[in-house]
Amino acid sequence: ALSLAMQTSYENGLYQFAYMQYHMLFMTAIYFVLLKLYVLHHNEMEQALYYLLKDRYNEFFGKENTKDGQLYFGSFAAIGESDVFKLLHIVGMDTNLEGELKKLVKERNDYAHANGRLLLTSEEFFLEKIRNFNHCIDRVFALIKHDILQLYASTLNDPDFYDPDIRAYLDPVQQIQEEIVKKYSLSRFELNWCRKFNIKQLESSENYASKKELHIALSKYYKELKSEI
């Protein structure tokens, strides 16, 4: 819905609104990355959150900031936007990227100020801002690429995932959708990495045919997603 609202604003020349909406989409992508880090680097994230939040730590994990007692992507919105980026140091974010991310937040705040001194009325200027967002999110996703590929490889090698006799869903596409895409909130970026995984390196492993079938199903699912854009 937010993506559609942004597109509508852009097509109607409402670049200021489109810019604000794109920033929200950008932060949502950041929150999903952080949620993945909470799963993949759980102990480090717990420690980082404790030091970052201090006396607000328990509140962060409280009922009002979780769903069914679990963190979800929106939980991270409870942390100030400039502060939440610090959690990316867990996967090697450098100070240059942190500075660029904080700059995006500062610019958004400047454009959102009620005095209206800064107005984004040019399509060219709007597209320049979007390129800045996209450049930064590409750098953020690059930080987790290795982790995602490791996750995919270990998942493919898990009998509970690949074995058709015991896995949750017999249909390979449904198994991919439910047990990896939804479970780990994988984006198109990450699915694209996974579909390029060299499945032949598992050729000598047990039940290779089932693993290959699931890998093909993931590639098919990715192509269907891409065709819908």
Predicted regions and their residues:
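Short coil/turn residues that cap or connect secondary-structure elements
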Residues: 10-14, 92, 206
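A broad, low-specificity signal for short, low-complexity segments enriched in glycine/proline
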Residues: 68-74, 92, 173-175
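Charge-enriched, short contiguous segments at helix-coil
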Residues: 82-155, 159
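Helix N-terminus capping/helix-initiation residues
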Residues: 80, 94, 122, 182-190
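Terminal, compositionally biased low-complexity regions
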Residues: 135, 142-229
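A mid-sequence interfacial segment
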Residues: 71-72, 77-86, 191-204
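Amphipathic alpha-helical interface elements
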Residues: 1-82, 147-165, 212-213, 220-229
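A contiguous, well-structured "functional interface" segment within a domain
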Residues: 2, 101, 205
